[in-house]
Amino acid sequence: MKHLTGLCNCSAATIATLLELASDYKKELLKSNPQFQPTLCNKRIALVFFENSTRTRFSFELAARHLGASTLNFAAAASSVSKGETLSDTIKNLEAMQVDGFVLRHPSSGAANFITTITSRPVVNAGDGANEHPTQALLDLFTLQEHFGRLKGIRIIIIGDVLHSRVARSNIYGLLSVGAEVGLCSPVTLMPPDADQLGITMFTNLEDALAWADAAMVLRLQLERAAGGYLPSLEEYSVYYGLTDERLDRIQKNLLVLHPGPINREIEISNNVADRIQPPGYSKSMLLEQVTNGVAVRMAVLHTLLAENGK
């Protein structure tokens, strides 16, 4: 694997290898004084973020440091991009500084694939427009596998703005690749038109979707969707598609709850559900576990691309 720009063409075997390595890294991360082999010692990784990020950027930075690499943090607003420099020129200039790899977040779909055509360095897609966010999907798969002990055959319902979600797209590709069953639940205005061609079960009623699923992945609702005419109002969306205690308690099953963050509390998910770590009821929030797993998964990705490819 030279780059990780998406999961659309990522094999089940590749996913399994990355998750196995992530599992080893997580065991060490959870120790009071974790010690890692510095497999990326003297490597320089450019974190090129054209959009804001908390979890993804910081976890990539931690992942790189755990493996002995140094990071260059690029912020578009404080760079020559603000003076009109193109993405292509930015990447070429960083490569000329002998950067060993790129982690890119960009608002344009296809940006990560584009820069693989202009650099010989490994590229990791940290989210490009509405296209893909592969490391988020990998950490979601890792979280599910840790809990269920497998991925094949489990049912995951993805709830919310599937149409515009790069997280949903990468998860759909990854989950189908490993043999999981995928369901989508959203208003028809936020459902991708090609979903029925992928062998996906579609729902418009949230209660039916939750009853079908083993795990629920709640997507962040981009608040501008109401203003854009995709929704009558945020309040109505919350009434019909918000994940609440009452909805989870009615299905009376051990449902796992995931969310990629950031959260719009009391819109797509209630405070109680988001924070339900050890519940008295039937469901469990994995939101913070996902964040922990993100560091281990991104360590696995960086090691695979920069250490193994450099042998």
UniProtKB/Swiss-Prot annotation:
Q: Which pathway features in its UniProt record? A: Pyrimidine metabolism; UMP biosynthesis via de novo pathway; (S)-dihydroorotate from bicarbonate: step 2/3
Q: What does this protein do?
A: Catalyzes the condensation of carbamoyl phosphate and aspartate to form carbamoyl aspartate and inorganic phosphate, the committed step in the de novo pyrimidine nucleotide biosynthesis pathway.
Q: Which Pfam families match?
A: OTCace (PF00185), OTCace_N (PF02729)
Biological source species: Chlorobium chlorochromatii (strain CaD3)
Family, as annotated: Belongs to the aspartate/ornithine carbamoyltransferase superfamily. ATCase family.
Q: What is its EC number?
A: 2.1.3.2
> Which reaction equations make up its catalytic activity?
carbamoyl phosphate + L-aspartate = N-carbamoyl-L-aspartate + phosphate + H(+)
Keywords in UniProt for this one? Pyrimidine biosynthesis, Transferase
The UniProt record gives the binding positions of carbamoyl phosphate as R55, T56, R105, H133, Q136, G261, P262
Q: Name one GO cellular component term.
A: cytosol
One of the protein's GO biological processes: 'de novo' pyrimidine nucleobase biosynthetic process
SUBUNIT field:
Heterododecamer (2C3:3R2) of six catalytic PyrB chains organized as two trimers (C3), and six regulatory PyrI chains organized as three dimers (R2).
UniProt superkingdom: Bacteria
Write out the residues that bind L-aspartate. K83, R166, R220
- PANTHER family from the entry? ASPARTATE CARBAMOYLTRANSFERASE, ORNITHINE CARBAMOYLTRANSFERASE, MITOCHONDRIAL
Protein's recorded name: Aspartate carbamoyltransferase catalytic subunit
